[in-house]
A protein has these predicted regions:
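Conserved C-terminal helix/tail region of periplasmic/extracytoplasmic solute-binding proteins
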Residues: 309-345
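Small-molecule pocket liners
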Residues: 56-57, 125-131, 214-215, 227-231, ...
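Secondary-structure end/capping motifs
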Residues: 239-318
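Cleavable N-terminal signal peptides
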Residues: 29-30, 40
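Short, glycine-/small- and polar/acidic-enriched structural segments
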Residues: 42-172, 178-180, 196-202, 225
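Pocket-lining segment of extracytoplasmic ligand-binding domains
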Residues: 101-104, 178-179, 184-273
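N-terminal export leaders
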Residues: 13-25
């Protein structure tokens, strides 16, 4: 079995509303040194937070293209890998940009009024998460989950998929025995027969399917759960460095298209990063992701509102959230970055 593991979801909903001060560089002495120091001070640093699951940033970090593109613009790049706490780092201003997070998680930062701006979206991948059961299970549909033990990561996109699937099948959350387990614990429980079903995302889903001992009884298709992913940046960074943000957006878009055009090559790179998964498993997982990077549109956030309303009703979000009440950055139509849009009324 592979050593793949995902960062814990515990604590991702906490938000710390403060920004860290940056230290000043020492001044040079003498005209030549002062000139050198001024050039150094003119350069800024883009701090990027990512995880092992952050496909596009992983590839950009490996090929060095982001450093080259931003270097021309006068920026250095600093990478910060997180096993957990990425959103807290964003909320506190410890990093300027974050890698993609699933639709549901973005809502928790919004509910906490974190000073974040949405700058890109990966379009929907509805089959990249699913409800699975053992191949020999008597469960053949969501309605059969009544009274059964179902493992899911609390507050994840999969949690929304489960709640939406239960509602469509005429079941309430209390009609099933929901076990809140992180992915690694859920994997052990599922394979050990301690839960009857598991709601999980790729590449865990692909790994289980490749082992050929599971069946999918529902995924996000047929309008059940779109499973979009969002990229966010601190408000301060967006307002001060739109040129850098545009370069990042363009490179994410290009890299996403490269992954879809070169699935085998991408799998060779990602397999060891993802815990030495078989390349075929990575290819299967990536085949279900769109990797289509587009600007975020306020008029296309209906799914976010459905998730927010569902989580509010389930008591997971303490306040009502209006999905369109966010800050959005979009690339300018003529090459210059557009200004950050104001909050929707």
């Amino acid at each position: 079995m592979s050593s793949w593991s995902m960062p814990s979801f515990a604590g991702r909903r906490r938000a710390v509303l403060r920004l860290l001060c940056r230290s000043l560089l020492a001044l040079g002495v003498g005209a030549a040194v002062a000139s050198y120091s001024s050039a150094a001070l003119a350069r800024d640093t883009v701090s990027i937070g990512y995880q092992r699951s952050s496909t596009l940033f992983i590839l950009l970090k490996r090929n060095g293209e982001l450093e080259r593109r931003l270097g021309v613009l006068g920026y250095d790049v600093r990478w910060h890998e997180f096993s957990s706490g990425l959103l807290e780092a964003m909320n506190s201003g410890s990093v300027d940009l974050n890698a993609d997070v699933a639709d549901a998680f973005a809502l928790f930062t919004q509910a906490a009024h974190a000073p974040l701006t949405y700058y890109a979206e990966e379009t929907s991948a509805p089959s990249a998460q699913a409800i699975i059961v053992p191949a020999n299970s008597p469960i053949h549909g969501v309605a059969d989950l009544r009274g059964k033990r179902v493992a899911v990561a609390k507050g994840s996109g999969c949690h929304y998929l489960l709640l939406a699937a239960l509602k469509r099948a005429g079941l309430a959350p209390g009609d099933v025995d929901i076990r809140y387990l992180e992915a690694s614990d859920a994997l052990a429980a599922f394979r050990g027969g301690n839960v009857d079903a598991w709601v999980i995302w790729d590449p865990f889903l692909a790994a289980e399917q490749r082992d050929d001992h599971v069946r999918v009884i529902a995924d996000g298709r047929d309008g059940l759960a779109e499973y979009n992913r969002f990229y966010t940046a601190t408000d301060a960074f967006v307002e001060r460095h739109p040129d850098a943000l545009r370069a990042v957006f363009e490179l994410l878009n290009q890299t996403g298209r490269w992954v879809k055009a070169h699935p085998e090559e991408a799998a060779k790179i990602l397999a060891p990063v993802w815990g030495n998964l078989p390349e075929a498993t990575v290819t299967l997982a990536n085949s279900r992701r769109s990797y289509e990077i587009v600007p975020v549109r306020r008029d296309q956030l209906a799914e976010q509102q459905r998730i927010a309303d569902t989580y509010r009703a389930a008591g997971m979000i303490p306040v009502a959230v209006k999905a369109t009440d966010i800050r959005i950055w979009t690339p300018g139509p003529t090459g210059a970055a557009a200004a950050v849009k104001a909050k929707a009324p």
